[in-house]
């Protein structure tokens, strides 16, 4: 029987699911994941200059995601998202909110006519590609350890952007008695 990576080491979960094995080549069901499913949702926010915040969430409901957005993103900031309905109320919280409509094959939009496509989420899509390729050699990560892997990847990604300033602050902490 094929065991999904999120259930590795948890025979009681697999037995409780009572599901038959599946072929590896078949794609899983499409849609947004939940912790009770085999693919927990990972939420990410990325500044255009490269700083990223990622977190594994129990679900993708507005009550879960909006507090995280409000804690992380300063009011008055521009926020670019897809048209998922949980983002509809961002303007009520003081954000300038622009969307791209992926279902209509819109991936970037030039709003002011200068030839530069300002409205897009391609930077974050590129980050997800990096994260997936980084996960690939691990061949499955349990749901218990996934937040640690995410935190490590977030740290490495952000530290790479900070460079010498991060190294200097780490050394200052280590040297200070």
Where do the language-model regions lie?
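Residue-level recognition of single "structural anchor" positions
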Residues: 1-177
């Amino acid at each position: 029987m094929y065991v999904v990576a999120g259930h590795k080491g948890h025979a009681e979960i697999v037995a409780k699911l009572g599901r038959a094995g599946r072929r590896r080549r078949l794609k899983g069901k499409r849609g947004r994941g939940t912790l009770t499913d085999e693919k927990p949702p990972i939420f990410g926010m990325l500044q255009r200059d490269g700083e990223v915040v990622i977190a594994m969430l129990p679900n993708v409901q507005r009550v879960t995601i909006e507090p995280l957005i409000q804690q992380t993103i300063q009011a008055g900031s521009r926020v670019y998202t897809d048209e998922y309905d949980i983002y509809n109320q961002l303007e009520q919280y003081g954000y300038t909110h622009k969307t791209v409509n992926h279902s209509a094959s819109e991936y970037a939009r030039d709003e002011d006519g200068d030839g530069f496509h300002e409205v897009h989420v391609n930077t974050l899509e590129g980050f997800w590609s990096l994260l997936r390729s980084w996960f690939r050699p691990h061949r499955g990560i349990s749901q218990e350890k996934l937040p640690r892997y995410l935190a490590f990847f977030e740290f490495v990604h952000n530290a790479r952007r900070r460079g010498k300033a991060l190294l200097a602050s780490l050394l200052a902490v280590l040297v200070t008695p």
